[in-house]
């Protein structure tokens, strides 16, 4: 289980994350999605202790299976927490196909179930209405 309590993070005087609290059960696949510039990458970097390498600060508590991540070797931590950064998408496919890769990786093969999970995730992130008509378009053209 990943547990985050009152996570704040920033660089210099600019605070980027403002008190995030979140619990992710062991084995649950979780996507962090949102508009450009909202702090997704910074949030993910806190989970792998990359913020400190870039001169950032953070406060709050992040524990992985009950252990504070500050006490875990970075290499071990980075093997346990998977991340995909918002660099240009590696696969020149549709948005829908790119979103389906993680589901297929975790054993979801049924096309209807994949479509439902993609829709559900986009709705939770409040992005569905924005991208629903673009799901079949190339992700490289966004």
Residue ranges and their predicted role:
Residues 64-68, 111-133:
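Conserved ABC ATPase "signature" region
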Residues 14-15, 75:
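Short coil-to-beta microelement around the adenine-binding A-loop and adjacent beta1/P-loop entry
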Residues 56, 68-82, 105:
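ABC ATPase NBD coupling module
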Residues 49, 61-76, 136:
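ABC ATPase NBD Q-loop/coupling interface
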Residues 48, 96-105, 115, 119, ...:
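Short helical segment in ABC ATPase nucleotide-binding domains corresponding to the A-loop/adjacent helical element
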């Amino acid at each position: 289980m990943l547990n985050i309590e009152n996570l704040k993070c920033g660089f210099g005087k600019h605070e980027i994350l403002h008190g995030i609290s979140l619990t992710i059960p062991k084995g649950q696949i979780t996507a962090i999605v949102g508009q450009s510039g909202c702090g997704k990458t910074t949030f993910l970097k806190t989970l792998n202790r990359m913020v400190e390498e870039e001169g950032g600060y953070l406060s709050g508590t992040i524990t992985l299976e009950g252990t504070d991540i500050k006490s875990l070797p970075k290499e071990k931590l980075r093997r346990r927490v998977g991340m995909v950064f918002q660099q240009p998408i590696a696969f020149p496919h549709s948005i829908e196909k790119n979103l389906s890769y993680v589901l297929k990786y975790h054993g979801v093969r049924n096309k209807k179930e994949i479509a439902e999970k993609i829709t559900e995730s986009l709705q939770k992130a409040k992005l569905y209405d924005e991208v629903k008509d673009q799901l079949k378009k190339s992700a490289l053209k966004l």
